[in-house]
């Protein structure tokens, strides 16, 4: 039954790429559940996913990052899907890569029920990553997705992608990030979660960080839609994902749109994060 969901994600990708091109970064006057102004592409991508997933009987319900609550499709269905239809959509206006994220939960939403994840990257080409037993990369060519390779992270990487407002970082966090650059880590940060994490996965390792800061103590990235799906992917690829001290996949949410500080990366970098944050 998961295969039907994966195939539907593949079908949605070129249509969403199309609406990205058509929207040209145009905004509506509306805001989503967490106060972000919505692009036309956000809402059109959301509509595509909702319409296509409604055709799959095994999907019990959907929760979009663009909406406050859940949409129940089939009460007898097996899977709940949380998704961000267009992550990093503010980058559309400047023609940078953006993405779509899916978390597939069995029964009800919750880290312990997450059984598969996927994301799509819309850039010069379209790429898809699906994580279930392993993490598989697909490239869209000649009207279809072709399997490219299985992704696996090295023990230690070379990329540093530091998010959140730097002026609001804890001094110890800033000291840690600066130490990575002093060791020769390369800055690779676009402001889009999907392309930045995709870069680390493709290049074989590194660190993406979005800590709690004085302007957002609980972080900015949403657990169900962004943090948990990517935590699943990174762990399946041989890496790790924590909130500073605890595995993201051990966290519990109280609201559909809860946020969390998060760090994704190779084992070496995540252990260093843990050692820094144990002292805070």
From Swiss-Prot:
Enzyme class: hydrolase
Gene Ontology cellular component annotations, sorted alphabetically: cytosol
EC number: 3.1.3.11
Reactions mediated catalytically: beta-D-fructose 1,6-bisphosphate + H2O = beta-D-fructose 6-phosphate + phosphate
Domain of life: Bacteria
Binding site for substrate: 87-90, 189, 220
Cofactor(s), by name: Mg(2+)
Pfam families: FBPase (PF00316), FBPase_C (PF18913)
GO MF entries: fructose 1,6-bisphosphate 1-phosphatase activity; magnesium ion binding
PANTHER family assigned: FRUCTOSE-1,6-BISPHOSPHATASE-RELATED, SEDOHEPTULOSE-1,7-BISPHOSPHATASE, CHLOROPLASTIC
NCBIfam families reported for this sequence: PRK09293.2-5
Name of the protein: Fructose-1,6-bisphosphatase class 1
Gene: fbp
